[in-house]
UniProtKB/Swiss-Prot annotation:
It comes from Pasteurella multocida (strain Pm70). Its main location: cytoplasm. The keyword Lipid biosynthesis applies. This is Acyl carrier protein. Keywords: Cytoplasm, Fatty acid biosynthesis, Fatty acid metabolism, Lipid biosynthesis, Lipid metabolism, Phosphopantetheine, Phosphoprotein. Pfam families: PP-binding. The modification O-(pantetheine 4'-phosphoryl)serine is found at S36. PANTHER family: ACYL CARRIER PROTEIN, CARRIER DOMAIN-CONTAINING PROTEIN.
Length: 76
């Protein structure tokens, strides 16, 4: 499974959204209905899945599906 597929799977699981809603440009808050707790849990799930640490100042910049994919790809 590619990084993109794994990130999307985590987003579907964490936010309880349909897979076809998880488009690269989708915003977690505006498009996928996440709140601040959801986004924290999403970052924690990404850290666990990819065995990386995402500092708070970086986590704040991860606001869309594509930004999450890009961050993981650049920090693997």
């Amino acid at each position: 499974m590619s990084i993109e597929e794994r990130v999307k799977k985590i987003i579907v699981e964490q936010l309880g959204v349909k897979e076809d809603e998880v488009k690269p440009e989708a915003s977690f808050v505006e498009d996928l209905g996440a709140d601040s707790l959801d986004t924290v849990e999403l970052v924690m799930a990404l850290e666990e899945e990819f065995d990386i640490e995402i500092p708070d100042e970086e986590a704040e910049k991860i606001t869309t599906v594509q930004s999450a994919i890009d961050y993981v790809q650049n920090n693997q």
